[in-house]
Amino acid sequence: YLIQVRKAFDAYKEKALKTGLVKLNEGEAITDHIDFFSVHLPYRRMGEKALAYLLRHEWRHLPRWKHVTKEIGMNEPQPKDPRGTIESILADTDFMKADEQFRRAFMQTSFYNETYEKKMASSLEASAQIGNLYTASMYMGLRSLLEFEFKKGTDLEGKRIGFGSYGSGSSAMVFSGIMQPTYKYIVKGMDLQNDIG
């Protein structure tokens, strides 16, 4: 899941930069230009892990990464085999243990938590209340994001929402959309608690 979503994210990034949809300034990641995320959720924690995985992938070559690793108190582990094949990485048990420790520590940093709260938490509320959503998860995540951000008073008009979808056959797709002014007429009538009874 994580590897396929990252590949799809890289393809989205390449297209977004090539077409001028997003223009990166010095020290920026494409994740800085996505206001909210709604992703495929086999379960809620997978969304949290997916965000951590994407942020690590995007931030590790930026100046902010040294501040992240300083807060964690360790450098990001590196696999022994420089080829970086999935087989060599999975076979490197010392790396896998260290990487899991690093991921957990990263998810406790202020950098991750600030981004998570700002860009993803609201899209996971429905999953927390309903449970596993599988096929409908990305769209239920969007509904959750819209409803809970609306209740917080967030104006989503003009905001970019990044979508990450994963399907059978180990394939993934990443795309984005911009919230239009008419969303308010739809979202003001949403009541997830009432709808799920």
Identify the function of each model-found stretch.
Residues Y1-G197:
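Terminal domain-initiation and capping elements
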